UniProtKB/Swiss-Prot annotation:
The chain crosses the membrane at residues 34-54, 97-117, 125-145, 146-166, 218-238, 261-281. InterPro entries: BP-dependent_transpt_permease, MetI-like, MetI-like_sf, OppC_N. It is a multi-pass membrane protein. This is Probable D,D-dipeptide transport system permease protein DdpC. It is found in: Cell inner membrane. Keywords: Cell inner membrane, Cell membrane, Membrane, Peptide transport, Protein transport, Transmembrane, Transmembrane helix, Transport. Residues 1-33, 118-124, 167-217, 282-298 are cytoplasmic. The complex is composed of two ATP-binding proteins (DdpD and DdpF), two transmembrane proteins (DdpB and DdpC) and a solute-binding protein (DdpA). GO terms for biological process: dipeptide transport; protein transport. GO terms for molecular function: dipeptide transmembrane transporter activity. Belongs to the binding-protein-dependent transport system permease family. OppBC subfamily. Residues 55-96, 239-260 are periplasmic.
């Protein structure tokens, strides 16, 4: 009897690792999430194969075909210098969608690592990291992003860097909160007792158990990052001419919106469809992985 009590006292808690295959199986029961996933897959395929799907050279100027409406020759019409809008929207997906993916990758990796370090180290290091994050969060995201992009200079790379910097604090706070919980688990304490390094604890225990909320945050952030990159492109702080970026295309077409509606409509629709697809997918992932959000979790 005493032996069984001692054994149960030292038995480690069950590890709840992220299971990607189980997540895919759960997604099948959510039609809205499946629909958004189909939209995302189609947009990603468009991004990858856009050079071969484009019907014209996206940067070819033809002043004899300027501002033509949608037709069999130009499916989305043409812009003010005769460039084919269908080809530019397709090729522009490489910049707009890739910008969102790169931003989330940078912010997610740096923010998750800083958050886990802050939660594991504690003390002064934790206080310094979190005070810096609090200062960044106290400034409106759009204002801080525009200020950083203006300071770095107008280009797509600088715009992505500015957006990523602004998004880092969200991942830091999320990862730190998870680290504070996971580090109290019995198996983590046992690994620490047996001399496991902090990097081992972060990589093999804390970070892996923090994946579900981080994936939710990332899936929601991609749509926001695409919108933010388009916003910077619209105001001239993102991609520059003659590159085909959706936000810059909408900015160029705003002077023709009353008569040549197609100039703004098609790149704007691409931004809307992509952002909504990623946001709906993020909502579906959150409902499945976060029980506090009212989703299903088994």
């Amino acid at each position: 009897m005493m032996l069984s009590e001692e054994t149960s006292a030292v038995r480690p808690q069950k590890q709840t690792r992220f299971n990607g295959a189980k997540l895919v199986w759960m997604l099948k029961g959510s039609p809205l999430t499946v629909t958004s996933a189909v939209i995302i897959v189609l947009m990603l395929l468009m991004m990858i194969f856009s050079p071969w799907l484009a019907t014209h050279d996206p940067n070819a100027i033809d002043l004899t075909a300027r501002l033509l409406p949608p037709s069999a020759a130009h499916w989305f019409g043409t812009d003010e210098v005769g460039r084919d809008l269908f080809s530019r929207v397709l090729v522009g997906s490489q910049q707009s969608i890739l910008a969102g993916l790169v931003v989330v990758a940078i912010a997610g990796m740096i923010g998750s690592l800083l958050g886990c370090l802050s939660g594991v180290l504690g003390g002064r290091a934790d206080a310094i990291i979190m005070r810096i994050m609090d200062i960044m969060l106290s400034i409106p995201s759009l204002v801080l992003t525009m200020a950083l992009a203006a300071a770095l200079g107008p280009s797509l790379f600088n715009a992505m860097l500015a957006i990523a910097i602004v998004r880092i604090p969200f991942y830091v706070r999320l990862a730190r909160g998870q680290a504070l919980v996971v580090r109290q688990y019995t198996y983590v304490q046992a690994a620490k007792t047996f001399g496991a390094s902090r990097w081992h604890l972060i990589n093999w225990h804390i970070l892996r158990n923090s994946l579900p909320p981080l994936i939710v945050q990332a899936s929601l952030d991609i749509g926001s990052a695409i919108l933010m990159a388009a916003t910077l492109g619209f105001i001239g702080l993102g991609a520059q001419q003659p590159s085909a970026e959706w936000g810059a295309m909408v900015a160029n077409g705003r002077n023709y919106v009353l008569d040549q509606w197609w100039y703004c409509a098609f790149p704007g629709a691409a931004i809307l469809l992509t952002a909504v697809g990623f946001n709906l997918f993020g909502d579906g992932i959150r409902d499945l992985l976060d029980p506090k959000a009212g989703g299903k979790q088994s």
